[in-house]
Amino acid sequence: MFLLRLIIIISVYVSTGAYTLYTSNPVKSKWLVEKSSTISIAGSTNVNRFCCQVNEYTGPDTITLNPAGVSFLGTLSVNIEDFNCNNRIMTGEFKKTLKYHEYPRLKIQFISLERMPSFGAASESVKGYVEVELAGICRKFEVTYSACRKNEENVELVGYRVFGFSDFGLVPPHKMGGLIRVNDKLDVQFRLQLHQINQ
């Protein structure tokens, strides 16, 4: 009698779809980070705001999405020399503050997502974790993403996070005897254009 009840319970469990998560065979997808991808770091001084950008991503990097473990794997490696703040003096101070001679690259390692986005035509918000390496210091952050599909083979993934110079042991620059001071807070955004390379 107990065995019969157990068989009935298992049958109902499977027929209602509760078993789908374990029997489904999600396929990993691999995505190329296209050159049109950008990364920006915006901040402010006691006088005005500034924004330093890399307007063309030159790394041949790929990102892997795995629905089975909701993993989001890959690393962006950005040459700090490529940042442009649209002001020669500000650009130089920005790079100097990031110690680009000693640590020439900013690295963003993707770790996980809270859930897999559907990548539909409408923008969808999802959170995840990344590890940022800057000036020789690594920090783990939660990032808010906006994901949408551009066409059959291309998606856009925009990540946003606020952190500070101090998170990486850096001191914000100041000029003119301290009359112009850069605030600690930075708004970081990476806008990734991703092209699927496996079908």
Across the structure, where does each feature detected by a protein language model lie?
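Bacterial Sec-dependent N-terminal signal peptides
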Residues: 1-31
